[in-house]
């Protein structure tokens, strides 16, 4: 079988396949024989219909079309195997089907033209990846991080002490009954809003909590005092009954509790850590936060390099890969929304238009991801970078332990680990070559520097775990 390849745009390959006459005749005869055995024609027993009658009743065009479709499928499979093509996705017919039917002769060769996406090769200027210049934010260690951590642990272990001799203050926990009312024309409480009512509700009196005005209104109230607090709800508030509305909240303060924090002493250090003294704990925390700042800076540098790396890619991307990456990003978004407690099924019940919008919106990110991944693969090949078997085994063992009890597809786990370790090694090498300007934290907007997601690896492992029973 003669196969001629043609490179097409968008990482496609065109094939011109010349099917020999022997194959055409064999398939055509098999189609006719199958039809004589299966077709139902009045006046004839099933399987006993003469060949001429079958051709007359069904028509040459139908029989030719059936034979051609079978020839196309068979010849494509043979061509892919013969030419060792890295095909992704399905083939499309470039020849005109009606014309093929007209010219088809079972006694003669048949030439068809098809096209398919192929796995792309990274195209880039030679050694351009050795000359990357980028900007990244430098994360500086702050002693405040230690103080904030200790304060957080204090608050977790705070004792709630009833307050009776003073009004509510910021930092207190207030227990309230509340109801909401529409604002009447005279500015007084009008009709009650049934959806907004509660009793024995705990309100932590901190700035930024709840709808603006509630906390400020409660601060200064005494126990058993009732007060009307005017509030304006934001337009995007999830409860439709009050979204964008001016509302009067009737608040009755039933209890005030003060958060009494434990002393930051050696006993506290023993309670929250493995250390016996507060000095030891603070020293360890300082070391941890210094290392964390260094790691975040390193992550920022690598993220900046990855973004620049994708920009060096000059080749074409196949549509099949772009669609697959869009699907992956939409699925990842759905997982993130579910983690936030949102009902993703409601989002997708809005119809195919909503799903397509999500895919369209993810397309730029999908393209950027693919370009970067292809460049990393090309550099790994060029620089002969790959993890050792021992490194892969060690990381796989760590992840198996981390996700102990979960169902894991071993093949996908190994592939994921090999890919992530290779990427890490490539980025370490690029970091040595790159000229990266470090800027103060907050200097770059999110669009200029992509900060790595702390959950990225976890999501990848979740994907590794998601093996259906059908696989």
Swiss-Prot record:
Keywords: Cell cycle, Cell division, Chaperone, Cytoplasm, Isomerase, Rotamase. GO terms for biological process: 'de novo' cotranslational protein folding; cell division; chaperone-mediated protein folding; protein transport; protein unfolding. It is found in: Cytoplasm. The keyword Cytoplasm applies. It comes from the Bacteria. Its main location: cytoplasm. Residues 171-262 form the PPIase FKBP-type domain. Belongs to the FKBP-type PPIase family. Tig subfamily. This is Trigger factor. The lineage of its organism: Bacteria, Bacillati, Cyanobacteriota, Cyanophyceae, Synechococcales.
């Amino acid at each position: 079988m003669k196969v001629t390849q043609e490179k097409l745009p968008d990482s496609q390959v065109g094939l011109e396949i010349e099917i020999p006459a022997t194959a055409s005749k064999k398939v055509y005869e098999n189609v006719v024989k199958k039809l004589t055995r299966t077709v139902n024609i009045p006046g004839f027993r099933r399987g006993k219909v003469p060949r001429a009658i079958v051709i007359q009743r069904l028509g040459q065009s139908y029989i030719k079309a059936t034979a051609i479709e079978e020839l196309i499928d068979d010849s494509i499979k043979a061509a892919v195997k013969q030419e060792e093509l890295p095909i992704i996705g399905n083939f499309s017919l470039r020849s005109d089907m009606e014309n093929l039917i007209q010219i088809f002769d079972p006694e003669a060769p048949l030439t068809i033209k098809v096209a398919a996406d192929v796995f792309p090769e990274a195209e880039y200027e030679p050694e351009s990846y050795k000359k990357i210049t980028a900007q990244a934010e430098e994360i500086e260690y702050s002693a405040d991080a230690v103080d904030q951590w200790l304060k957080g642990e204090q608050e977790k272990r705070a004792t709630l002490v009833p307050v009776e001799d003073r009004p509510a203050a910021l930092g207190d926990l207030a227990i309230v009954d509340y109801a909401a009312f529409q604002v009447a024309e005279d500015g007084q409480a009008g009709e009650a809003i049934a959806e907004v009512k509660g009793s024995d509700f705990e309100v932590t009196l901190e700035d930024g909590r709840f709808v603006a005005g509630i906390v400020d209104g409660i601060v200064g109230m005494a126990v058993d005092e009732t007060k009307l607090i005017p509030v304006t709800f934001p337009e995007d508030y999830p409860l439709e009954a009050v979204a964008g509305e001016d509302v009067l909240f009737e608040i009755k303060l039933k209890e005030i509790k003060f958060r009494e924090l434990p002393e930051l002493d050696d006993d506290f250090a023993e309670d929250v850590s493995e250390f016996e003294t507060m000095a030891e704990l603070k020293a360890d925390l300082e070391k941890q936060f210094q290392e964390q700042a260094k790691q975040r800076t390193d992550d920022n540098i690598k993220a900046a390099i990855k973004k620049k790396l994708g920009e060096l890619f000059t080749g074409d991307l196949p549509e099949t890969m772009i669609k697959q990456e869009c699907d992956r990003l939409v699925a990842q978004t759905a997982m993130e929304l579910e983690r936030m407690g949102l009902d993703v099924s409601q989002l997708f019940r809005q119809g195919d238009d909503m799903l397509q919008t999500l895919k369209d919106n993810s397309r730029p990110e999908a393209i950027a991801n693919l370009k970067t991944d292809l460049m990393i693969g090309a550099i790994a090949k060029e620089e002969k970078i790959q993890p050792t078997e021992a490194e892969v085994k060690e990381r796989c063992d760590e992840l198996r332990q981390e996700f102990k009890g979960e169902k894991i597809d071993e093949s996908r786990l190994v592939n994921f680990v090999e890919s992530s370790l290779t990427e890490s090694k490539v980025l370490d090498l690029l970091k040595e070559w790159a000229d990266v300007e470090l800027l103060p934290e907050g200097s770059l907007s999110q669009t200029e520097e992509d900060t790595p997601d702390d959950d990225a690896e976890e999501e990848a492992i979740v994907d590794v775990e998601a093996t259906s029973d059908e696989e």
